[in-house]
């Protein structure tokens, strides 16, 4: 990993706020992916954390650039100090919610931090980008509810028709939970790494790395790799409480549900 010669060593210290935000995100948002599986005792926490950590990192590095571009249009934080404060404010908010065992959107936290920076620095806020970010907050829960209802109805009807034995059904259910959790973890990394490292992309201290003639890792991807590792550590060290809240305390769920 190459650091730019012109980079101030303080930049690496400022990045600590993004690492803290990444850790907080992993501690809180992993419940969205594996909370139901762990809460229903179908997948152990250790296995869920390992799978989630691996696929979060992959999603962040491979597919994280698109979300970062959208977030960057909301408001340009072109000062490293501003990036540090925005990430720190979001990280503290998410950590506080996690301490209470409450699931919280990291996207909402970082958007609020960026808006606060724009207000403090008298910077322009792109309202079209803000609307683009806010609209899924309304559409996503509704769409998820509809899709979940359809999938649950189809799965229940399918199981009645094929009449699988309980032991085989248990095995298939565990496998389905693991596969869906891995996909969810990949999406979590791809969509949320912008919340962790997006404000630091314009001031990245890293140079692009060429591993082979055909494989180049960009400066942003190096940031996303570090952020993905921070998220994975948060999953391993502090996510179990929120997982149990989502998986068993909010509503008692069957393994199929």
Model-derived features with residue positions:
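Membrane-interface alpha-helices at helix entry/exit sites of multi-pass transporters
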Residues: 41-53, 84, 128-130, 209-218, ...
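Core mid-bundle transmembrane helix pairs that form the ion/substrate translocation pathway
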Residues: 134-191
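C-terminal ends of transmembrane helices
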Residues: 31-38, 90-102, 155-162, 235-250
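Short, non-helical or kinked segments that cap or interrupt transmembrane helices
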Residues: 27-34, 42, 100-112, 190-201, ...
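Alpha-helical transmembrane segments in multi-pass membrane proteins
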Residues: 14-24, 48-60, 64, 85-93, ...
């Amino acid at each position: 990993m190459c650091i730019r010669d012109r980079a101030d060593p303080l930049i690496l210290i400022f990045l600590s706020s993004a690492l803290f935000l990444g850790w907080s995100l992993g501690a809180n948002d992993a419940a969205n992916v594996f909370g139901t599986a762990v809460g229903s005792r179908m997948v152990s926490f250790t296995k869920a954390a390992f799978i989630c950590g691996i696929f979060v990192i992959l999603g962040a590095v491979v597919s994280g650039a698109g979300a970062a571009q959208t977030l960057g249009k909301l408001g340009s934080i072109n000062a490293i100090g501003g990036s540090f404060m925005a990430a720190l404010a979001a990280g503290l908010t998410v950590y506080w919610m996690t301490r209470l065992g409450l699931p919280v959107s990291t996207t909402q936290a970082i958007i609020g931090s960026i808006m606060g920076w724009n207000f403090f620095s008298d910077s322009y806020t792109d309202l079209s980008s803000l609307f683009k970010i806010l609209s899924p907050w309304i559409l996503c829960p509704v769409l998820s509810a509809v899709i979940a209802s359809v999938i649950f109805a189809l799965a229940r009807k399918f199981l009645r028709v094929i009449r699988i034995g309980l032991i085989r059904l248990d095995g298939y259910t565990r496998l389905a939970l693991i596969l869906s959790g891995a996909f969810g973890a990949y999406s979590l990394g791809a969509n949320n790494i912008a919340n962790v490292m997006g404000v630091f992309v314009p001031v990245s201290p890293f140079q692009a790395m060429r591993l082979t003639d055909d494989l180049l890792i960009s400066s942003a991807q190096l940031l996303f790799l570090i952020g993905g590792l921070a998220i994975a550590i948060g999953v391993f060290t502090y996510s179990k409480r929120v997982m149990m809240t989502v998986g068993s305390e909010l509503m008692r769920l069957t393994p199929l549900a």
